[in-house]
Amino acid sequence: MQKATYYDNSGLFGGYTYPKPDSYNYGPAHQSYPTSNIDSDYQGSVCPIQTAAVRPPALKDSDLNGDCMRQSSSQNNNNNQATSISEQQAPPLSASSPSSNSSASQKKKSPSSSASSSATPALTKQIFPWMKETRQNSKQKNSNNCATAGSDHDGGEVSDEKSPPGPASKRVKTAYTSAQLVELEKEFHFNRYLCRPRRVEMANLLNLTERQIKIWFQNRRMKYKKDQKSKGLAHSPLGHSPDRSPPLSGPNHIGYSGQLQNVNSLSYDAPSPPSFAKPQQNMYGLAAYTAPLGGCIPQQKRYPGSEYEHHGMQSNGSFANANLQSSPVYVGGNFVDSMPASGPMFNLGHLPHPSSTSVDYSCAAQIPGNHHHGPCDPHPTYTDLTSHQASQGRIQEAPKLTHL
């Protein structure tokens, strides 16, 4: 068995001869052992690790075989551990030069059990304390640290609130008392944004933290904005609002504005008669009927040779006549209208004008000199109106018409 064990390991001892079991003669006593044989021939053995560095001059055959037997038996049990140790220890041992016999004998006498026992703690030392921590525990610790830091330094302000320790800790909702809410609402009524000195003062007054007051004001401002938006949508007009209608320029003036200016390009500044009992209602309703005048463009008629466009106001009754097609006509350059409930015709030409240039008609100069209104035959002629005005005794000379 000793021979078989030695012959199995004879590849490691290539330079030695083995003549007889009872003789102790070896070939060359000292021979440099190449390191390539360690790596290529047999890497898993512990014997070349201990014998390659120093070659002893003479050893007993029984000691040598006994060491190899014990190491080969331990190698079968701890093959993986010995391989890892040999790979770790081979470079420094192979690079070292031959030393004294005492160090070699100490290496020889160390049993394989000590080598195997040293291999186990070497592997156990690789497990560090940080490897024992699981990811879940580290996440919980990090979340607790972040929550604490966030509660301490939120918005650049320091507060004494800290999240309670625990894996699933949640911030407790602050319950404000009625007295605190009243004071906060009062402060919000005067100032929607608090400065820091005032916030510190209120925190001391209400026994709250600055952070709580700051968050309450943020939430209250958002609520205020939502309320304003809801109110704005509720009160938004669907049609023309009263303030959008053109206002009257004065109690004695009528202005065609807005849509009529875009269509007709006319501006009338005719003063209303002071003899009206209800001047606001008898000003022909021009301010109130601005939108209907713009909407009844298909009913309009056109004077030949002029840009004046009149509208048949059948719905409002301001310009209605017996033939339902009446419209304002020109009487010597004056603006004449027929009232729905009154028989006499009101001629605005008899009223005193501030100046003859205050009444501007852009289309009057284009009307022919005979004052004949082409398609407007149903209306009374110029002579009829002048005779009707003569019966009233309020005839005045018509102002001279000029271009704008």
Curated annotation (Swiss-Prot):
Pfam family, one: Homeodomain
Coarse class of the protein's main subcellular location: nucleus
Segments carrying motif Antp-type hexapeptide: 127-132
Biased composition range(s): Polar residues: 32-43, 137-148, 383-394
Record CDD domains: homeodomain
GO CC aspect terms: nucleus
Region (Disordered): 1-122, 134-173, 227-256, 372-404
InterPro entries from the UniProt entry: DUF4074, HD, HD_metazoa, Homeobox_Antennapedia_CS, Homeobox_CS, Homeodomain-like_sf
Localization, UniProt: Nucleus
GO biological process: one example: anterior/posterior pattern specification
SMART domains (UniProt xref): HOX (SM00389)
Positions of the DNA-binding region: 169-228
Keywords: Developmental protein, DNA-binding, Homeobox, Nucleus, Transcription, Transcription regulation
Biased composition (Low complexity): 71-122
Compositionally biased spans, kind Basic and acidic residues: 151-163
Protein role: Sequence-specific transcription factor which is part of a developmental regulatory system that provides cells with specific positional identities on the anterior-posterior axis.
Family: Belongs to the Antp homeobox family.
Protein name: Homeobox protein Hox-D3
